[in-house]
């Protein structure tokens, strides 16, 4: 709630993206990817939204094909909050098209991986101090250690993460903003 007294960017940094890796990551993934973020050394974004999928998270088209040495990822995402200055991304991709929503998995993709392109910034009304970009994945190769959580459980993990983010960012921030407005109103009325 106290973060609601400040700018939205602080709330996003404090609560935004840790849940996927914290709850689904292996000890090695937590050490490699999450710990540097907690220490303030790295930043990452979740990249679930796609142009063709809209609000239907199960309709994503980014595809991860299993290879002998890991995965090959192709696709695009958009409206990725903080994507311009993130060091890596947690993304969802279809790993088994036949299984529909049970065929979506979650991956950790380093921004500097060959084939990762950060596209144009997509301005959002009322959200200052952040960016919302397009991401493109063209034959991005990742090892098996980049699969986050269980194969085929990515949509479930993503929706759980979004629920936690909404609780932390939206609800707590709204209460914080309301108490801040109340205090400012009382201070003004007392003058």
Which sequence ranges carry the predicted segments?
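Short Gly/Pro-enriched turn/cap motifs at secondary-structure boundaries
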Residues: 52-55, 79-82, 96-98, 124-131
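Glycine-rich beta->alpha junctions and the first turn(s) of the following alpha-helix
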Residues: 116-191
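Internal helix-loop-helix
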Residues: 1-41, 81-88, 100, 164
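A short, Trp-centered hydrophobic/proline-enriched beta-strand micro-motif
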Residues: 40-48
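A short core secondary-structure module
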Residues: 74-118
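A structural signal for short hydrophobic beta-strand segments in well-ordered beta-sheet cores
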Residues: 64-65
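Short beta-alpha junctions and helix-cap segments that line functional grooves
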Residues: 33, 60, 76-78, 119-123
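Residue-level signal for inorganic ion chemistry
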Residues: 26, 75, 107, 137, ...
């Amino acid at each position: 709630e106290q973060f609601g007294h400040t700018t939205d960017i602080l709330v996003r940094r404090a609560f935004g993206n840790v849940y996927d890796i914290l709850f689904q990551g292996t000890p090695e993934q937590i050490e490699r990817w999450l710990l540097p973020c907690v220490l303030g050394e790295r930043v990452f974004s979740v990249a679930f939204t796609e142009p063709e999928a809209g609000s239907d998270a199960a309709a994503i088209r980014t595809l991860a094909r299993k290879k002998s040495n890991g995965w090959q990822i192709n696709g695009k995402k958009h409206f990725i909050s903080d994507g311009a200055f993130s060091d890596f991304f947690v993304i969802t991709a279809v790993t088994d098209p036949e299984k529909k929503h049970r065929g979506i998995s979650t991956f950790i993709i380093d921004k500097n991986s060959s084939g990762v392109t950060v596209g144009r910034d997509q301005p959002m009304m009322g959200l200052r101090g952040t960016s919302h970009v397009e991401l493109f994945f063209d034959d991005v190769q990742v090892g098996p250690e980049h699969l986050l959580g269980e194969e085929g459980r990515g949509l479930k993990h993503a929706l759980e993460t979004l629920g936690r983010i909404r609780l932390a960012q939206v609800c707590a921030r709204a209460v914080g903003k309301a108490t801040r407005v109340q205090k400012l109103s009382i201070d003004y009325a007392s003058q």
